[in-house]
Regions:
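ER/Golgi luminal nucleotide-sugar-dependent glycosyltransferases, focusing on the catalytic module
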Residues: 2-169
Length: 169
């Protein structure tokens, strides 16, 4: 082993996970291919629309949620705990529950469904990227992930954890 290879961290096997829907078009997909397509396995936890999306042809795993079923989001939350029903139902957080506006419940449900499916896979990945299909990737940089760590973008100052891009072990 050369001294240079000792200085380089071992390559981490990566699963690139897309949640939500595949509305982004060709530009985000092509930027994914250019920056990560050869180095990551692709996983989709998405709605059942956009069946002709190129993301589907490249994915190793595809888990779909039937977006036409108005109760699928409630059933997903109930699978975790029915306690959520006792809390105030604020628009943008619990939408589309009981006709409320917003999509907070939807994106959290996609995260939950992704989790439920990932824990069934063999432990072959060192790193997981969580993002959406409507983002353009300008770099192939992914941080080397330490066990028990989650990396999220800095500088957005929104005070929470984003669904737009994070990397974890």
């Amino acid at each position: 082993m050369s001294p240079l290879s000792l200085m380089r961290p071992a390559r981490q096997k990566t699963l690139f996970c897309i949640i939500g829907n595949l509305r982004g078009g060709d530009m985000p997909y092509n930027s994914y291919l250019e920056n990560f397509g050869d180095d990551c396995d692709l996983c989709l936890c998405v709605g059942n629309r956009y069946q002709d999306s190129p993301w589907r042809q490249h994915a190793k795993y595809i888990w779909e949620i039937d977006e036409t079923d108005t109760q699928v989001w409630e059933m997903t939350y109930d699978g975790v705990s029915k306690e959520w029903r006792t809390h105030n139902h604020l628009e943008n957080l619990w939408g589309p529950y009981q006709g409320l506006k917003g999509s907070g419940m939807i994106i959290c449900s996609f995260r939950q469904k992704l989790y439920e499916n990932l824990i069934k896979l063999p432990m072959v990945y060192d790193r997981y990227v969580l993002t959406r299909a409507d983002h353009y990737y300008v770099s192939n940089f992914l941080p080397t992930v330490k066990p028990g760590s989650i990396y999220i973008p800095i500088g957005e100052a929104y005070g929470g954890v984003t669904d737009r891009f994070s990397v974890a072990d």
